[in-house]
């Protein structure tokens, strides 16, 4: 098996050690540098778009000319610039992932970009909870709720709606502080009341799915679903916590939630209801 080749980083002294995760357009890596004998760690998100030549060919097949294709990917770059600017505004805050640097390099053919975002190294919530074979401790769920509520208060102070709160976007520091990350689709309130569908439908508020007008309350709803999921044996609402659901059961549960049915108390054995009520 060939050894994986990592991209070169644009910051002096920083080198990629290993891949931590992979997403639709890129990957997150562990990066290190030796600073006066002290080893520093960071997480680096590397996003490349287009992903490959097939994406470009598809654009031309769809009728784009060269200028339009270049503009398409330039607009995609603006999304990541916006994400960096939002995270930079929150740099140093306890409950929001701290972003340290950003670089964007155009592709040699002039079509597309490589984006590098360097952030503090943290543990994903989804990784942390794997150590719990059974029930996740209520104290942990309450701590997640309080910390991410603090993050949302900061977002509110900047008139920002995150729009994609889910377990994968919550991190924890070595000191036990939970942090909200990935502001890639966050928007200011001025641009959020429009009926746009973004984020993960698994944790999306019904009004967003229905393309109705919405505001900051959709983030609170999504956080509530994350906490419910943690307390309900990692099952979302309307799914029995005590057995492995079928595909049809998952689809039916999603449809009931989108319809706005009250969340069931019985499946959570009253535990989730009482904990969420006291947050």
Features from the language model and the residues they span:
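Conserved catalytic-loop aspartate of Hanks-type protein kinases
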Residues: 219
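Activation segment signature within eukaryotic-like protein kinase domains
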Residues: 144-145
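Conserved small/polar residues in nucleotide/adenosyl-binding loops
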Residues: 268-275
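Catalytic-loop of the protein kinase fold
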Residues: 156-172
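Conserved short submotifs of the Hanks-type protein kinase catalytic core
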Residues: 110-125
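Short beta-strand micro-motifs within the conserved protein kinase catalytic domain, predominantly
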Residues: 98-113
